[in-house]
Amino acid sequence: MGETLGDPPVDPEHGAFADALPMSTSQEITMVDTEMPFWPTNFGISSVDLSVMDDHSHSFDIKPFTTVDFSSISAPHYEDIPFTRADPMVADYKYDLKLQEYQSAIKVEPASPPYYSEKTQLYNRPHEEPSNSLMAIECRVCGDKASGFHYGVHACEGCKGFFRRTIRLKLIYDRCDLNCRIHKKSRNKCQYCRFQKCLAVGMSHNAIRFGRMPQAEKEKLLAEISSDIDQLNPESADLRALAKHLYDSYIKSFPLTKAKARAILTGKTTDKSPFVIYDMNSLMMGEDKIKFKHITPLQEQSKEVAIRIFQGCQFRSVEAVQEITEYAKNIPGFINLDLNDQVTLLKYGVHEIIYTMLASLMNKDGVLISEGQGFMTREFLKSLRKPFGDFMEPKFEFAVKFNALELDDSDLAIFIAVIILSGDRPGLLNVKPIEDIQDNLLQALELQLKLNHPESSQLFAKVLQKMTDLRQIVTEHVQLLHVIKKTETDMSLHPLLQEIYKDLY
């Protein structure tokens, strides 16, 4: 990208981001109008005004989400958690899959964990972690640690096996009228009372369930834990209110949530299946079948497919930046930070969040585009000429590993807030208030993951490691943009993206 990629004129003190941020006084900052090929610019404090982008050369509405490096966590409580960059997957195979294979591939993944429930959001004040006994689910029969949901109740392996043997072998025990107390140490002393306790708590051979714990049962259990935690720590109710606030803001800011995307990818939606784009012919058909927000101008339709797709990615990136900015303004304490620090946090954080949320739209075979109307295959994107064919592959590699963590939207709402409030960004003026906010968010995220994923004891550390991976992906993305700038002299980058990428890694 030659001379057309020069930096656009912006406010020298704050830049284009400042126009989208609230002011602490009545003073307003407006961005100088910039004329660039392909896109007019208008980034106001209000929600995205799509009408001003109608002339954008947009072919496919892929969410090109980006990311960066998380070398340290600002809160001292978390500094000793090791971060490692996962080895990238190698996928160097020829593109020879057919349409039918990709249509079936859309449904290869299990559905994402269900929608957010307020009952699942349980938090503690910093450094006031609840006892381990509250975190473990107890066997309803003897009080030992439950291994899962067996015969209709949470039970340990011992009581599960005892009940199964009794039912299958039709065992009859000598009657006991002492109503013996059944606990971990005494459970083997009186088999009659133990079996009666199994029946009393609801164990039944007809209640065998396969798969994960039902959401209703999970919420009931978490509500019981919530009550116990609130009794020990009354302030946890305030943090749960914070979690609900973040989730509500997340839902309002991002139209296509992970839950909606996974429903489309797994075929669990009443809407029609997305149109699959897997080669040049299906690409041309898709332009007729998919309702894109922006029609490609006639003068741009003759451009090479790789360039048109890349420009479509740019448009979606700009739209995503505005969505993330709106979300950031709803994080408690963010708008009270120095305006320059707000701009810096967004500059370095938006692409990390973009790639985090892009993972929700991906499976190992492709990515949803145009709000779920289309599905563009991974192999088709990789088949584009270099350097364009190299852009999406690192994002797919990250997405496959990140999706394996099975975070849901309520987890992601806190996770992306943690990304934004990173106190180690270059050029911050006042780090202390940023670290204070992030420390609170980290505590919230840790407890959220413990309660929402009780079977994954190391999930918090794994999630933090993904923040390191995200920064590496952004670094690689910026390097590819430098290559395009040198080789594609007839292309231009959107002025807002130019400002974000300027001096970024």
From Swiss-Prot:
Domain NR LBD: 238-503
One GO molecular-function entry: nucleic acid binding
Glycosylated residues (UniProt): T84
Keywords: Activator, Biological rhythms, Cytoplasm, DNA-binding, Glycoprotein, Isopeptide bond, Metal-binding, Nucleus, Phosphoprotein, Receptor, Transcription, Transcription regulation, Ubl conjugation, Zinc, Zinc-finger
Zinc finger (NR C4-type) residue numbers: 139-159, 176-198
DNA-binding region in chain numbering: 136-210
Domain of life: Eukaryota
Consequence when changing S112A: Increases adipogenic activity
Modified residues annotated as Phosphoserine in this record: S112
GO biological process: animal organ regeneration; BMP signaling pathway; brown fat cell differentiation; cell differentiation; cell fate commitment; cell maturation; cell population proliferation; cellular response to hyperoxia
Domain topic, free-text comment: The 9aaTAD motif is a transactivation domain present in a large number of yeast and animal transcription factors.
Family, as annotated: Belongs to the nuclear hormone receptor family. NR1 subfamily.
PANTHER family listed in its UniProt record: NUCLEAR HORMONE RECEPTOR, PEROXISOME PROLIFERATOR-ACTIVATED RECEPTOR GAMMA
Name this protein carries in UniProt: Peroxisome proliferator-activated receptor gamma
Native organism: Rattus norvegicus (Rat)
Lineage: Eukaryota, Metazoa, Chordata, Craniata, Vertebrata
Gene name, Swiss-Prot/TrEMBL: Pparg
